[in-house]
Every structure is written in C-alpha cells, then in structure tokens.
C-alpha cells in the first residue's frame, strides 16, 4: 500500500504531465516534487509549494499556476478536497476513510509496517566506531556506535542490504604504544624501578593486562630497567620530546624481546582490549557483521593491490625515494605519501587499500562514519576513491561530533591517554542502554551534543525516551484494564467502525501513524536517524494528549473497539520505531 504522501506526489506528477502535454508548461522541466505534512489541521493533511517553485521557470504567477495544477489533478478516492492558500500553496485534505485504512494496514503488517523498498536491495557497507583497540570505549565512541547501528536499522527498514563493519586498527603505532605500556607495567610487577613514559597508556586496564601476562608468563620477559633506557633520548618530563621517546622505547622493547616476544605482548593486549570492546558493544545492542583487521590488508596483499591500482591509472609518482599519490589532481590540498623512503607504507596507504577492498567485495554504496576529529580524512578518502575509478557519490562520509557529558550542571572531563576517561560501560550503567541509545541519536550527528546525565535518568515528560516508553506502557495498561473489567476487544468490529473516530485527537493520531513509513524513507534517504527520534516523541505527545482527553474504554462497544484498534496501531508504530532506535518498549513502567 502506497503512503498518502506518495499518492499526492503521484497526483501532482500526473498534473504536470497533463499541463505539459497540453502545451501550458515547458516539456524540459526538471522539478523535484516536495510534499510536506501540514502544520495546521485547518490547512489540511498535506501541502506543496510546487506552484511557487514552478513560477520562475514557467514565468507565471504562483497562484495562477496553482489554479492550473489543481484543475488537472486526477480524481482520487483518498482525497476529499484540494484548496489553494496564500501565494500559491496547494493543500490536500484526505478522506477519513483513507486515513482509517492505515489502521487496518498496521494491524495486518505488525512489525513489518513501515518497511519499504527505497533501497531495492542495494548492498551497503557501513563502517563505524573503529576505535583503536588500545583501551575501553569511551562516551565519545558511544555516540558513533549508536548512530551507526541506528542508521543501519533505518536503511534495512528502507530496503537496503546492509553490512555493519568495525575496522580493527591492529597494525599501527598506537598498538605498539599499548604493547610497550603493558610490558613496562609487567616490568614494574617484577620489581623494576621503571619511569613510565609520558606518552604511554596509563589506564587501570593496562595494569590488569600486565598482571595477566605476569601470571601466565612469569619472569621470562623481564629485563633490567637500566638496559631498557640505556642511551635513550630524554622523555618530556626531562625536557625531551615524548613522541621521540616513545618510539625509541618501542624500538628498544622490540630489540630486547625479539619479534616473538614483542608480538606476545602485542597480541595479548589486542585480544584483551578487543574482546572487551566486543562485549561492551554487544551489551549496548550494537552488533557487527564483520570485524575487519587492518593487518589482513598486509597479509592478503590488499595494500599492494590498492597501490598498484593507483599506479596503473597513472596517479602516482616518486620523489626523494618515496611513492606519492597525486591527490591534488582530485581536489586535495596536497599530494599524499603512500610509501615512505624507508619502504614503510603510510596510514593513508592502508586507507586506500581498505576502500579498494570494500568496493572489491561488491558493495554498491559505502558509508564511513568518523568522529569529528577525523574531518581531515574526508577529502583524502574521497580523492582516493575517485582515483580508484569509483563514483564519488557511492561514498558517504558522515562526521559525528563527540558527546559532552554534564552532571549537576558541570562538565565531565575525559582523556584517553591519561586513563581518566568516562567509559561507555560506565555511562550505560548510570543511565541505562535505552536512554543512551536515544539521546545519542536525538540530534544531527554533526551537531555538538550536551548529554545531560540527570535528564537521562529522570522519570518525567522532559526526558524524551521516558516520555515515549511511557506512551507505549500506557497503551499496554489500557489493554490490561480491558481484561480486568471483563470487556472484550473485537478487532473486526473495530475495523468496521473506524468512521466513529471523529475526535480531533483521533484524527491527529491517525495522521501521525500514517506518516511513519514516510519518516523511515526520509531518514534513510538523508542518513538522518534523528528524524525518527523526533517523530516518536511527536507521536508519544499525541498519544498522551488523547489518553488524557478521551474515555478510551467507553460503554459503546463499537466505538470502544474502534478506539482500541487505533491504540494498538499506535502501540505497534511506537514498538517498531523504538526497535529501530535500539530502545526497548516496556509494557509497564
């Protein structure tokens, strides 16, 4: 069944064709027809500014165009009347029977209501979170996790074939810093008088991993501290450079431990942290289809294949012993190094190989979700994709601003390297998964987010997730009261008497639930899950107003059954929408 908005868009398109065929409008017009929900019931159910958009290319007054369009709009049983308002807006009033049909559709489709075919089974890969496996996820990662998972659910509901992927950065410098941090804490447990590097990872989890290594391996990897720091450059507290020092101590650890010994610390730290990340995300309701290892790009030759693909297309050159990508040819501010003069590939080379691999796996569309601190990566990734011969429009890069926590009006500080961060797990334990999942997606991803912990825990109408869940629970309580009072809900009787739903609150609710499929399609088309969060709050508000104003379990059986059909439809839509957001729909609160 087509949505009412889709019906109106079709009618307007036919009206345009009619005017073009009669010579009253240019044939070569390329106009996007936009239909909006009317903000005021007095202006109908839907409205369009099509006549105003056509005024300039057609060189006619908007109101005259509106009159001509309305005159040739085909008749449709769903439409009661059409009016022209203001400078040329066209307002559509739908028949109550058309609105009521949506109730029958919802009750028949249940959990499948709202699912569409916008995506036409296109294969989409969404990569998100992808935090370095160097420590627990913090609350900033949580926003990206909630956004990516919800976007995946929205796209699935809109008919896309979605794969969710976490890119594991297990081959870079940060992992070496973690490995050496664990080793140094291991030496400390052995009684060595270490001085911990300014640039090392200092969290409690580093101690815990070191303790595991000490318990399992004993002292076989112990070396005297003096041999570790002999002839090393000064660290930052002694006036040196912390980056130079940490690189030097990594090299010393690799030399003393050997390849296998250092790999032992590297792999143990990686597995421990990655297992913790997986458990954390699983508990948050975020489930990935694929955990893609950066190291695998080296092992399966993807790094070389990605670089060779750029070479074959003539997009590389050599300078001072290094291999460069001609990024400026594709709009980047400067060319990028792929292979350094020492033969080491760069992070950018891994990015090229990873995206080459994504398209090589047959995905029609790729969505990268990065933290806002990665804004510098956007252009270089897009230039690489374009240089590899792929349509730039098949890549979407979405930047998600980190969340800022507030407790009691005061900002909560966090810092990963210092170990004093607030973890995602701590946030979930404090406010619950439901509040975290909703609050994280309630705003556009590019907008800064102030996460009010006190509000997220409050049981009031000011807390949007509580307000929405309470609407669902209220409907369930009505159904329980029905049984307690010995009354029956005859669904067939209710569906036959939907014309009895004459109250304005009922008309508002019916219009709201009819919009649900449109919200899903719009949220999917624009990659904006917050549209669904806003919509559910609006629907909950409509339900609460209805609940407070109307006697739902009235004596008149036909009306009571019709109202129960409406209530169950609202409950189903709330349930479906909350499921997409990753939020539970409690039956009692």
From Swiss-Prot:
Catalysed conversion reaction: tRNA(Arg) + L-arginine + ATP = L-arginyl-tRNA(Arg) + AMP + diphosphate
One Gene Ontology term of the molecular function aspect: arginine-tRNA ligase activity
Alphabetized SUPFAM superfamilies for the sequence: Anticodon-binding domain of a subclass of class I aminoacyl-tRNA synthetases (SSF47323), Arginyl-tRNA synthetase (ArgRS), N-terminal 'additional' domain (SSF55190), Nucleotidylyl transferase (SSF52374)
Broad class of where this protein is predominantly found: cytoplasm
Disulfide bonds: none
Protein EC: 6.1.1.19
Name listed for the protein in its UniProt record: Arginine--tRNA ligase
Organism listed in the record: Legionella pneumophila (strain Lens)
């Amino acid at each position: 069944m087509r949505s009412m908005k889709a019906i109106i868009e079709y009618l307007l398109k036919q009206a345009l064709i009619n005017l073009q065929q009669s010579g009253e409008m240019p044939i070569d017009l390329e106009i996007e027809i936009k239909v909006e929900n009317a903000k005021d019931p007095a202006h109908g159910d839907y409205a369009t500014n099509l006549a105003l958009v056509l005024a300039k290319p057609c060189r006619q007054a908007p109101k005259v165009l509106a009159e001509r369009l309305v005159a040739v709009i085909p008749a449709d049983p769903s439409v009661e009347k059409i009016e022209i308002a203001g400078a040329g807006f066209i307002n559509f009033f739908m028949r109550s029977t058309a609105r009521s049909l949506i109730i029958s559709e919802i009750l028949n489709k249940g959990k499948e209501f709202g699912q569409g075919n916008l995506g036409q089974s296109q294969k989409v890969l969404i990569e998100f979170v992808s935090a370095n496996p160097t420590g627990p996820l913090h609350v900033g990662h949580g926003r990206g996790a909630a956004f990516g998972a919800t976007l995946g659910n929205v796209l699935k509901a809109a008919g896309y074939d979605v794969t969710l992927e976490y890119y594991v950065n297990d081959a870079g410098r940060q992992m070496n810093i973690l490995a050496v941090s664990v080793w140094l804490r291991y030496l400390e447990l052995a009684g060595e008088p270490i001085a911990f590097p300014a640039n090392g990872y200092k969290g409690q989890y580093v101690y815990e991993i070191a303790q595991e290594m000490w318990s399992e391996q004993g002292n076989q990897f112990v070396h005297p501290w003096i041999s570790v720091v002999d002839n090393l450059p000064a660290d930052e507290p002694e006036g040196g450079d912390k980056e130079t020092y940490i690189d030097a101590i990594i090299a010393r650890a690799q030399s003393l431990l050997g390849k296998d010994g250092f790999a032992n610390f590297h792999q143990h730290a990686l597995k421990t942290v990655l297992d913790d990340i997986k458990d954390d995300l699983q508990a948050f309701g975020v489930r990935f289809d694929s955990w893609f290892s950066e190291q695998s790009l080296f092992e399966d030759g993807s790094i070389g294949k990605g670089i060779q693909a750029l070479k074959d297309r003539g997009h590389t050159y050599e300078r001072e012993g290094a291999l460069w990508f001609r990024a400026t040819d594709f709009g980047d501010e400067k060319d990028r190094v792929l292979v350094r003069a020492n033969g080491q590939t760069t992070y950018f080379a891994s990015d090229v190989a990873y995206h080459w691999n994504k398209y090589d796996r047959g995905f029609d569309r790729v969505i990268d979700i990065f933290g806002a601190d990665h804004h510098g990566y956007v252009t270089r990734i897009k230039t690489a994709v374009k240089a590899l011969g792929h349509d730039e429009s098949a890549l979407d890069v979405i930047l998600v601003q980190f969340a800022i926590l507030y407790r009691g009006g005061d900002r909560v500080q966090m810092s990963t390297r210092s170990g004093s961060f607030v973890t995602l797990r701590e946030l979930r334990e404090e406010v619950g998964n439901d509040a975290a999942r909703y609050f994280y997606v309630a705003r556009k991803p590019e907008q800064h987010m102030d996460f009010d912990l006190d509000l997220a825990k409050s049981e009031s109408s000011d807390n949007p997730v509580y307000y929405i869940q309470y609407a669902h629970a209220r409907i369930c309580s009505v159904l329980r009261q029905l049984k307690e009072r010995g009354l029956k809900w005859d669904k067939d009787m209710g569906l036959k008497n939907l014309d009895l739903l004459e109250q304005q609150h009922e008309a508002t609710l019916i219009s709201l639930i009819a919009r649900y499929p449109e919200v899903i399609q719009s949220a999917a088309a624009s990659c904006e899950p917050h549209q669904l969060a806003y919509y559910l709050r609006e629907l909950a508000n409509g339900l609460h107003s209805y609940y407070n104003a109307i006697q739902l379990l009235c004596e008149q059986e036909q009306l009571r059954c019709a109202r129960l059909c409406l209530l169950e439809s609202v409950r189903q839509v709330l349930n479906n929408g909350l499921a997409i957001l990753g939020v539970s729909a409690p039956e009692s609160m």
